[in-house]
Amino acid sequence: MIPKIIHYCWLSNDPVPDVFDKYIKGWHEKLPDYEFIKWDFSKFDINESEWVREAFQNKKYAFACDYIRLYAVYSYGGIYMDMDIEVIKSFNTLIDKPYMFAYEGKKNQGIEAGCFGTDKNNEFIGKCLDYYKGRTFIKNDGSFDMRPLPQIMQEIYNKNGYNYQIYSHEYFTAKSFNSGIVNITPNTYTVHHFAGSWKSDAEKDRIKRLQYLSKKYGWFGKNYAELKSAHEDYGIDGIIELLKSKIERKVVRRK
């Protein structure tokens, strides 16, 4: 059984944004019988992990929290939530199992790392923690290792052949990263609003533009925005790679 503990992380010295405060108040309203643990400087020694220390020193707090969320859930059990998570209803109908995971996207690609839970010392979460052992956030070429945690978790899950029941996108995400459209169903427990604090301002602007075009022009707008972003980043090579990836995904789905 998953303990009734909610873990969340805030490492910045900046004030917590009002919108996050609003979500956290909602957590307490919807989950009155849960314990809440805030992970900050007083709770976690950033020098315990080279990854966390380097990410923190470079103000990439979301990546420092990638390790801390795994550490918190592994050490205590419970549920981790990003601060941009809106709780729709209590988890009480899910926590009788030893874990709760859902996919981040509708195509069952990437495990949602913004909301997940397990009992204490969960093997899968332990292996995710092992991924960071001896790993540095600053790569040999001086760039940052900004690989998203959902991809890391999915890779480790697949590599080890786990057979967990993983819920669909509608359970803990319920929002399109590309379009920004929220789709709450009877199965929805939380909505992940994708604040994307780790993204640059330019990346955030591109996401907003893509979401606007998707909402206004649907499929055409979404694909136009993706092509435009690929061209801005990598020129004609970016467009070619984007089209190749779309074709490959269609081939895989047809098999």
Enumerate the language-model features and the residues they cover.
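Glycosyltransferase-associated regions of secretory-pathway enzymes
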Residues: 1-65, 83-255
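Small-residue hinge/turn detector
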Residues: 67-78
